[in-house]
Amino acid sequence: MTEYITVGAEDRVEARSNTIKLHGPDGFEGMRRAGRLAAEILDALVPHVVPGVTTQEIDDIVYRMTLDGGGVPATLGYRGYTKSCCTSINHVVCHGIPSDKALKDGDIVNIDVTPILDGWHGDTSRMFLVGDVALKARKLVDVTYECLMLGLAQAKPGNRLGDISHAIQSHAEKHRNGVVRDFCGHGLGRLFHDSPEVVHAGRPGTGPELKPGMFFTVEPMINIGRPDCKMLDDGWTAVTRDRSLSAQFEHSIGITETGHEVFTKSAKGLDKPPY
């Protein structure tokens, strides 16, 4: 097993503000670099997410790639979390902890990474299909990715956060899926979690107005069944209460003068992730 180093405690103090920060060109450049590293890590995982591989082995790869890229994993040591990524399998909604559990044929798994590079956080997650996956699971993954992209289409100056939320909720519920309310997107940049909170269900025309320089994540969690979640005893892992399948995609973005920039988009120019 990899011998991990962690970010010092002085880097773990987060003074989240109720004020939404507006960033300039230096912030955009910092987020581009951090986001590029995050996307490269997920791209590199594709051939490794196969039956028989353990989520701990995946975590080891994420750790090594983050350090090799000049960064450190934001999650490692964060509020006592001991891993470099989150691996959420099947009915796990988010924050699944890597372990010696091996992936099985037919699993769907979300891998969530956040490298810190030069003080900036690149937060992103993607679904991976393991072997031969059932049609209903593939459909859930497709719908969840569509929810993310429809939400991002509303990310432009003059719109409001509720426009993003409504686009996601409308598409998910059109397909009779549940939108998780217990977790949300968040502002980020120099901090891992900052204002605003970005919920994934809501009414159009509500919430803070989007302005150039705002940085935040959009990360819908969509369930085949009901949206309700429960926490496991480890204090991190959230699962669907009805044990239905759950999927999630996440991008970090910045609002520009004319729309938005996706910091964590793959450089491979894919229309959708290679799942």
Report the location of each language-model feature:
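Active-site neighborhoods and metal-handling regions in enzymes and metal-associated proteins
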Residues: 1-275
